[in-house]
Each structure stands twice: as structure tokens, then as C-alpha cells.
């Protein structure tokens, strides 16, 4: 299996947002940002992962999702990922009953991954 490659410019960008918006210390901000980029790379390789993030209303949300290529293509209209807004992390959430929906959250609200 190929190693996961993380773009350092993305890590720095998200870490800076975490420091400014959430008042995080540098080490925590960089660690969360690197973990988010590793999560994205894993999801794009077809893995299904579970993670936590803070919703806009302050509640903590646990979700399970993927960015598996064929699933993304089947759920995309017009060739663009829904909610593709700078600063948002868009993903396909997989529910226990098998149905899937597009979701997104603010990058700076990422808490961490949960081992599956």
C-alpha cells in the first residue's frame, strides 16, 4: 500500500486558522491539522474512518465517512463536490442503515479520529 502523503502547506494553513480562531497552542494546532490531512488522504484511498468534530452550535458530533472515488462520483452532480467551500471539509457520511449523505464541517472544528 502506498504511503499517505500530506501537503505541508495545507497543514500550515489549517494550523494557522486553529491558532487564530480557537486560540490553540502551536503544537496542538499543527498536530490536529496533520491528523485532518492524514484523515483526508485515508478517506480518498477508500478507507472508512470515524472521527469527531464540534458543530457550529457547540455540540460534539461523531461521524463515520469516506471519500471513496466511485461513491463520490455516484453522488456528485455536475462534476463538483457539494459544499466545496474554502475552509470546509466535505465528506460522505455512511449511516448504520447503509444510506449515505454529503456532510461538511469547518476545518478548525476538527477534534480527532477514532480508531475503527
Residue ranges and their predicted role:
Residues 67-101:
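Acidic, aromatic-enriched beta-alpha/helix-loop junctions
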Residues 22-39, 64-78:
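Charged, amphipathic alpha-helical segments
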Residues 29-31, 86, 96, 106-109:
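Acidic, Ser/Pro/Thr-rich low-complexity regulatory regions
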Residues 1-19:
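Eukaryotic low-complexity, non-globular regulatory regions
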Residues 72, 98-116:
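Structured surface patches comprising rigid loops and adjacent beta-strands/short helices at the edges
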Amino acid at each position: 500500500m502506498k504511503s499517505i502523503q500530506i501537503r505541508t502547506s495545507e497543514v500550515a494553513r489549517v494550523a494557522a486558522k486553529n491558532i487564530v480562531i480557537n486560540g490553540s497552542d502551536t503544537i496542538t494546532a499543527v498536530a490536529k491539522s496533520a491528523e485532518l490531512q492524514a484523515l483526508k488522504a485515508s478517506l480518498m484511498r477508500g478507507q472508512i474512518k470515524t472521527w469527531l468534530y464540534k458543530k457550529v452550535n457547540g455540540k460534539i458530533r461523531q461521524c463515520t465517512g469516506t471519500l471513496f472515488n466511485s461513491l463520490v462520483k455516484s453522488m456528485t452532480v455536475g462534476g463538483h463536490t457539494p459544499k466545496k467551500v474554502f475552509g470546509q471539509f466535505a465528506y460522505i457520511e455512511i449511516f448504520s442503515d447503509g444510506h449515505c449523505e454529503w456532510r461538511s464541517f469547518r476545518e478548525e472544528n476538527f477534534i480527532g479520529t477514532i480508531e475503527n
